[in-house]
Amino acid sequence: MVLSMEDKSNVKAIWGKASGHLEEYGAEALERMFCAYPQTKIYFPHFDMSHNSAQIRAHGKKVFSALHEAVNHIDDLPGALCRLSELHAHSLRVDPVNFKFLAHCVLVVFAIHHPSALSPEIHASLDKFLCAVSAVLTSKYR
């Protein structure tokens, strides 16, 4: 997935609104994913799945921090996400469809917290970015 200059600018603009809320937004995205797609819980058998649990908040922060790094290195997503790609493919063996589930939940979080900023163009750019991230994260599966 090729991101245009406009896409990159749009992603950086909307992501700037999340930069102070990485843990909060990350936890919310994970909670939504676990609720909407309960099969994703299989990768977290040791987690306390209750609302606002410390484990979900900590992992949500990790997820959104990784996305933050990807935004900061938007011109080199494979380089920025190489370690995570290998981890998820070889060690954790996460089913690739789960990245799409999480991407959808990330979009929902932005829609809830920043409805006026998430114009159709920004929404499309953020979706393309999350698809590009998913493609990189699944690239080591092949």
From Swiss-Prot:
One of its GO terms (biological process) is hydrogen peroxide catabolic process. It comes from the Eukaryota. O2 binds at residue 59. GO terms for cellular component: blood microparticle; haptoglobin-hemoglobin complex; hemoglobin complex. The keyword DNA damage does not apply. One of its GO terms (molecular function) is oxygen carrier activity. The keyword GTP-binding does not apply. Heme b binds at residue 88. Residues 2-142 form the Globin domain. Keywords: Heme, Iron, Metal-binding, Oxygen transport, Transport. It holds the Pfam family Globin. Red blood cells. Belongs to the globin family. Heterotetramer of two alpha chains and two beta chains. Involved in oxygen transport from the lung to the various peripheral tissues. This is Hemoglobin subunit alpha. It comes from Alligator mississippiensis. The gene is HBA.
